[in-house]
Amino acid sequence: MDARSRPVLVLGADSPIGLTVVRELGARGVPVIAHGRSERALGRFSRFARSFLLDKRPLADWLPDYTMAQGLGAVMAVSEGHLVELAALREALPCKVLTPDAERLGSVLDKARTLEAARRVGIAAPGDWQPVAGEDFAARAAEIVYPVAIKWADPNAVRGALEDAGIAFEKVEYAQDPVALTTILARYDGIGSWPLVQQYCPGFGLGQMLHMAEGNATLRFQHRRLREFPPSGGVSSFCASVPLTEHAAQMVKSEQLLAALGWQGPAMVEYRFDPATSTYWLMEINGRFWGSLPLAYHCGAHFGWETYACAMLGEDAAEQGRGSAVAAPLRRARYLI
């Protein structure tokens, strides 16, 4: 049976990200089953989805049996939560799992590991402090240069504890002085775990997106963040594509970083770029399809298809020229919150 004739399950078709993956595969004749957690999932209504599956249960409760019953050729996913679940299920699924294994996923979910790897390949990383039990937080806070950003090193590892304690998850917070910092840290004393404290980096958000296969990038794209929600830092609500002729040397470093991590598949290397000093500060690596994937799609960079084709069809992406600059006109994308 031809690989392209076997159905592919796309987990997380609720969002514009998942919808984009459904479109890219379905438009090329791949039978796509769009999975969502809501009856109003966007992917459900795409003409490129062969069928829709609504299931809110943990993947371990249904995916192995479903894979067998449907004869799936592959499973793809959008959210970090699904990536974590799939990493634990890889050996139980009789199909290709087009998401990172546990070791590679851990290298990007843990920001401390990511930043250490970046320093080894010559990428600037902001100074940071990971508070641990037994430290004198007040004394350490008094030594730090402000302002600072406070974010969890591995958000998925603490969400359960935060929820059990009735503490809201904060993607990022800022402190302007020691009192503000210690007040924020004290909020988490009850769970015995504290977020990472990171040097504030001026500039604007620059995302460099790559698809990696066997140590090389087969597709590249980049965007600049114009607006975020909330404005203090969060998801990209307005962004613009950037020609690959710009920030070219940093794109090479991004590829080197992902190669050093042994990365396979799509990833976004996210920087804060300061034009005043021409400094690129690494913020994190998103080891998954990112929020502005629709922008890449409309600029002709089809990362969903690239992920599928390289893994399932064995196409030589470099030979096809998909690692070259995107020829489509530059575009901007708005995400309505």
Task: Identify the meaning behind each predicted range.
Residues L105-P195, E214-N216:
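Active-site nucleotide/adenylate-binding loops and adjacent lid/helix of ATP-dependent enzymes
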Residues L196-V197, Q264-V269, A317-V326:
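Flexible, glycine/charged-enriched surface loops at secondary-structure junctions
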Residues C299-A309:
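C-terminal, active-site-flanking charged/polar segments
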Residues A309-I337:
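Peripheral (often C-terminal) accessory segments that flank ATP-dependent C-N-forming ligase machineries
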Residues A175-P231, L244-V252, R272-F273, Y280-W281:
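Phosphate-binding site of ATP-dependent enzymes
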Residues Q208, A259-P294:
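Conserved metal-phosphate-binding beta-hairpin within the catalytic cores
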Residues A157-V158, R227-P230, V235-S237, N286-G300:
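Glycine-rich phosphate/pyrophosphate-binding beta-alpha loops
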Residues M1-D101, E135-A138:
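ATP-binding N-terminal substructure of ATP-dependent carboxylate-amine bond-forming enzymes
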